Amino acid sequence: MRGETYYLKKDWSFIEKAGQVALMKADYTLFYVSNQATHLLRLLAERPHTEEELLAAVEEKLTLTECFYLLEQLKQRGVIGCTPAARHHFLLIHTEEVTAAEVERLAALLSEEDEVEVAGQWEALREVAPDNLVVLCVPHYHHPALTAFNRIAHAQHWHWMPLAIGDDELWVGPRFESGEGCFECLGFRFYHQSPVVHYAYLQSDCHLSTHRASWRQLLAAAELLREEADAKEQRLTLVKRTGETTEREHHFLRPWPHCPICMGEQPVEEGVPVRLQSRPKIGYTDGGDRTEEAQATIRRLIDRVDPFTSEVGRLTPMVTPEEGYGYSMVVSQWATLRNADRLWNGAVDWKKGRIQSLGVSAGKGQSLAQAEASALGESIERYSSQYFGYEPTHKALWREVANEAISPRVLIPYSESQYAHREEWGKKSDYSHIPEAWNEEIPLHWSKGWSLTHQQLRWLPTAYLFYNFLEEGVAYMYGDSNGVSAGNCREEAIMQGFFELIERDAAGAWWYNQALRPQLDLDAWPEPSIQRFRRRMGERGFRVWALDLTTEFRIPVVIAIAQTDNPNVPMLLGLGAHYRVEVALQRALAELTQSLREDTEAPEGHWWHTVRQANPAYLYPDPTQPMRRPTDFIDQSTDDLLTDIERAVALMRAEGMELIVHDLTRPETGLNVMRVIVPGLSHFWPRFGDPRIYQHPVRLGWTARVLTEEELNPVPFPF
């Protein structure tokens, strides 16, 4: 035996679900594996194994030849690695000038069989002069030594750089000094961009990717260290080697404004009062009203897109304008805190339940630039909606804040029956999870909102405003994205969030009451993009129609629907709302595009099977009502976003409703994010304690009578 220890490389995760076995790479690509390889991978996913351990564990399933053949195949494909069992965890060196000689010293230490004495390395740092550069060599940037050392280095005003020498990669930098920008700023983004990978490293006790570095690797590291030590910017440099070719990437770091290490205790503005200003529009643009063209937004923010050093990791085109018949879709990845920290400290098991540790959003538009800007905005919106821990809150009983607060019962109006059957509802869909019931004797954390209607403070439950906020470990409500939007300015974000509330209020009334609605005469809309989309969808076998869901606010709301002749393929749905009906229709069609890759037969348990069997007439045009044409809608838009907001406030006030906003903007993102709340509007998720969901369709003339809770559509709205 050669005494080697095998391990699953850290950019791979082993997944077993519903009888299928797969490997997931760090970019979330799935690879399914054979039954024979499963035996080995299952063991290596748990922990590293020596050859002796592997052979003993699989001797009844694999022959000696089969075992070594599979190990060699997995090594060649970069899934597993092997290394001598004895090794050190990390190494510290310090020098006035980073030279090849110093890295040769590193090589000598790396070549030792015995583990380097960590205490001795820390002891040596007592002699570090202020101008010396400390290089911390670790197996990988997920190593906890980096975070621990960063705190000490910052307090001691050391200049230092991390270095990782991997099988096929060199990681160097950034160079950290005593000012702003430290490893905590990097680690916050780096770890939350890939929480499952980071979790796997923590579980592995950080041994898996260390190896004896070759002289060639060490000399390359020495050269790279010299370059990065002189770099003017704080940057992480990654060198990848594939065969004889090498590829170099630079990833630039910005300080995290709320870093507890290098930024200290920063005062956090509470966001009230919210002062708005005139914001002239640039004219009609793809996707709605903006103060800046999509291309300009992308140019301004593209350097904030980075998989290691930023809040938004990647923008990946999924549907081009050609594939989307005039519309594009771009998927974006963002740094997620949702369950990530609980995942890392063992509070949850990522293999069980609905652990949302992968932050992925989608954007759409008629142009690729608009789809990219939309995806970037969606990512920043979701990132900013997370609870980080530095946000100001006030803990109080309901009676202590009731005069200025909005009750959770108004914001999430579940019925008594729904609370009594929480588990059954939770199994229906990802969007029908019902929290624990709250009563007024349970104190809550409250955050400040601002009423644009009354120009005064409104206390709002913190758990309603943010993702992943728990009251003493209990969820009395779940944060969601309803009414949250990102924009180039506050006013832009507020209008986008407001239109989202309007479209979902209308969709909830229609869906749960199964109300028949008239269709739009799509032939009457001359926009080339609309007609091209219809024609191309028809060539693909889809019929496309759109229903009018406009309510008493007279803000056009449209749901676009597409269906094939195959009854087992789910309908595709897309919603849109705007002061101008043509924009509402464009938005609905663009959102429908996000489902174009889902035109396959619905699996067992899919919502479509339940809806189809119930004869869903409400999904089709009402033949008794005339088709809607552009002249049937009024245009309430203006040339200034502030005036549009004032009109929205007036529309809500006329119906006895209040428009409230909460500023979620994070300074590191470059966009404004606002949450818009109108207590009393319905959601399109099933909340059957809401009086409006019953009475609203009757007042509109959509239905003849108020339905009972048992008569409402039991299928949750599908997104």
Explain the meaning of each model-derived region.
Residues 1-28:
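Long, low-complexity, charged/polar intrinsically disordered regions in eukaryotic proteins
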